[in-house]
């Protein structure tokens, strides 16, 4: 069967212009105009999606099939082009019957054109074919427009759904244009409003806990650039002005305290000859406290010295992915669970803004994994937030899973974050030694987010940084009172 792409090529119909008109009309629709005004960050993300729309429309037109009636009419037209005028005259009745049978828009006009001329000349033959071609072009253009209109309605419906989702989550997850773009890409999945309302709920909870939000931001910024002195610095010459007392006798201007032996007052010099005062003399000499004559003529001169020039290279510390392990034991339920989930949501926000990855592992008796920064990040976040914390505590398995993940090349610069109350058994010696090796050899950093003031110091000593957020009732009341 004839494809629409082939028909467009045969009739020289430009579908590109039709596609551009459709996209312009879509972007100018009132729904998008209101959305762009309300969420300007997402405007750039949607605009960046236009090439994908354009390619999808091209593919749709390319694969579309032409209706059988139009295909048969096109074939008849092509055959008629090959006929000479005498042959065309012979075939004309069959051509008119075929057009009538196919309900072609050209059928009635073709018969009127033939009836208006008693003789079929070569010029009439050419005119007949030209008008027939125009009729086919109109039909092909109409078919293109119908398909594009169907695609426009479908695309507009999809965009509206994604706009609704992105508009709800933009205040929670999009901190800049980069995050807005990644959020828009994630919104392509099939999600119901009831699903992503869970993210909205924890986003509102996070806003009610500004200390927890600031803690996540501090952890995200913890890798700062540091200056590294260079060992290969060369010696360079520096000029400096130094003051030296004149060595020739000059006019006495007064007295001063100094260590100038040549200008000592006689009483000071006399103390040097007294045994009991000799040490006192030397003390005052070292401290430049001897009374001396002050002379005119102290001179300044330029002195040339050589010293190594201090150059510093700024070693930009890479902000790698987050590998977050969350304790889902029973002691982490209730308010602790809410804080842990909201903290992970804050890390997801940072990861989207800084183009980092955010990988969540829930540890209890087994380990469940979620990647919140991937193409299915919103769906993964919803599944994570739906989890209930009712398991046991197996901190050793958590560390083993982290260390296994850090062996991969794509995670070599990751920051490991463990969220727990750290009320657990001590870590095995092999786990402790392996963590210290990763810290020493590969400069991996382990962060602890302590949800309790009663965590075991022996466990927490292994971490590079400990971020404390006490969820006890007293601490919660104090934080609320300070706000």
Swiss-Prot record:
GO cellular component: cytosol
Gene3D superfamilies xrefs: von Willebrand factor, type A domain (3.40.50.410)
Cystine residue pairs: none
Subcellular location: Cytoplasm
Keywords: Chaperone, Cytoplasm
Protein's UniProt keywords contain Cytoplasm: yes
Keyword match Cytoplasm: yes
Pfam families documented for this protein: VWA_CoxE
Range of residues in the leader sequence: none
NCBIfam families found in the cross-reference section: PRK10997.1 (NF008230)
Protein's job: Component of the RavA-ViaA chaperone complex, which may act on the membrane to optimize the function of some of the respiratory chains. ViaA stimulates the ATPase activity of RavA.
Subunit structure comment from the entry: Homodimer. Interacts with RavA.
Record-given protein name: Regulatory protein ViaA
């Amino acid at each position: 069967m004839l494809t629409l792409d082939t028909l467009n090529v045969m009739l020289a119909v430009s579908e590109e212009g039709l596609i551009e008109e459709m996209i312009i009309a879509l972007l100018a629709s009132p729904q998008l105009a209101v959305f762009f005004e309300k969420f300007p960050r997402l405007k750039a993300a949607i605009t960046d999606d236009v090439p994908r729309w354009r390619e999808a429309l091209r593919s749709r037109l390319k694969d579309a099939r032409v209706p059988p009636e139009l295909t048969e009419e096109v074939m008849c037209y092509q055959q008629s082009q090959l006929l000479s005028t005498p042959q065309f005259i012979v075939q004309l009745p069959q051509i008119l019957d075929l057009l009538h049978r196919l309900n072609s828009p050209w059928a009635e006009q073709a018969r009127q054109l033939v009836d208006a001329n008693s003789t079929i000349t070569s010029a009439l033959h050419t005119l007949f074919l030209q008008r027939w071609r125009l009729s086919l072009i109109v039909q092909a253009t109409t078919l293109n427009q119908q398909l594009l209109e169907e695609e426009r309605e479908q695309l507009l419906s999809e965009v509206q759904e994604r706009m609704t989702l992105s508009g709800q989550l933009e205040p929670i997850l999009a901190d800049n244009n980069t995050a807005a773009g990644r959020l828009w890409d994630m919104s392509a999945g099939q999600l119901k409003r009831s699903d992503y309302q869970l993210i909205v709920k924890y986003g509102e909870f996070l806003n009610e806990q500004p200390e927890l939000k600031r803690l996540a931001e501090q952890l995200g910024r913890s890798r700062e650039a540091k200056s590294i002195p260079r060992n290969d610095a060369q010696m360079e010459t520096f000029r400096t002005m130094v003051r030296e007392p004149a060595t020739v006798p000059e006019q006495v201007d007064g007295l001063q305290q100094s260590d100038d032996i040549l200008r000592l007052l006689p009483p000071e010099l006399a103390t040097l000859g007294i045994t009991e005062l000799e040490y006192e003399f030397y003390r005052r000499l070292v401290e430049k406290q001897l009374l001396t004559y002050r002379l005119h003529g102290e001179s300044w001169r330029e002195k040339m010295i050589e010293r190594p020039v201090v150059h510093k290279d700024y070693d930009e510390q890479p902000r790698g992915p987050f590998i977050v392990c969350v304790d889902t034991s029973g002691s982490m339920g209730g308010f602790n669970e809410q804080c842990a989930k909201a903290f992970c949501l804050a890390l997801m926000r940072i990861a989207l803004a800084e183009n980092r990855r955010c990988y969540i592992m829930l540890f209890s008796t087994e380990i469940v994994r979620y990647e919140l920064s991937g193409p299915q990040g919103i769906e993964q976040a919803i599944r994570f937030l739906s989890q209930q914390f009712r398991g046991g505590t197996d901190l050793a398995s958590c560390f083993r899973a982290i260390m296994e993940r850090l062996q991969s090349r794509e995670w070599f610069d990751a920051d490991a974050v463990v969220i727990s109350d750290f009320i657990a058994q001590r870590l095995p010696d092999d786990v402790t030694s392996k963590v210290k090796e990763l810290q020493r050899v590969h400069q991996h950093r382990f962060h602890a987010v302590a949800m309790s003031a009663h965590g075991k110091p022996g466990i927490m000593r292994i971490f590079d940084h400990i971020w404390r957020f006490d969820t006890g009732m007293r601490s919660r009341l104090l934080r609320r009172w300070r706000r």
